[in-house]
Amino acid sequence: MAAEWLIGQRHRVTLHARHAARAEEVRRAVPEAEAVVIGDVSTLQGMRAVAEQVNALGHFDAVIHNVGIGPGEPRRVETADGLSQMFAVNVLAPYLLTALMAPPQRLVYLSSGMHRSGHADLTDAQWRARRWNGSQAYSDSKLLDVLLAFAVARRWPRMLSNALEPGWVATRMGGPGAPDDLALGSATQAWLAASDDPDARVSGRYFYHQQPQRVHPDAHREELQDALLDYCAQLSGLALPAA
């Protein structure tokens, strides 16, 4: 819905799909999209492939990082790179895509209200030592997404970098019974990506339904932000470029 809103405002929109079959579904659902890039962002190779395709298309004004695995993951899944799939998709992918893509004017990272139950301790971020808990792993990843958004806002002060929670909405992840307003969740993504509203032209903030919200106190701790950037750089082999 965010894509449709942006297209309706005459913005040119590129979408992402995990594989070719899904890309065809996306093209049928949003035929006005400029392009669809394809790649499995659970792997470093797939993340790099997506970034390469995006950069080949030219400069983007805004990027919305909204790919994610939900809290219902029943077991730990290990990727080809030996990482937790939850961490790879929800945290490392937005980090590496941010580091590899030509910098846009705005970055939008999707978090969740569940981030407030998350932990920013990276000691066992891959869930190798702990018994798997999908809900906790998801909450942790969504807190790390806020840390990432705020770290980018601090490192790249000329860019607008924000995070948001769309709410518990009726998507494939949220399920059909989710009670929140899907339209408002999507509108907030589009608003942060493209609006000239002064309230949207800010950086290092967290939103819900276009309103600033409190975050987990750890999200503002610069040492935790830096630790996350260092950890992701170690895993991916690429540090976040200087501003």
Regions found by a protein language model. Name each.
Residues 1-17:
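Canonical Rossmann dinucleotide-binding motif of NAD(H)/NADP(H)-dependent dehydrogenases/reductases
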Residues 16-20, 41:
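N-terminal Rossmann-fold cofactor-binding loop
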Residues 30-45:
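Rossmann-fold cofactor-recognition segment
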Residues 68-76, 83-84, 106-158, 165-178:
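Catalytic loop of short-chain dehydrogenase/reductase
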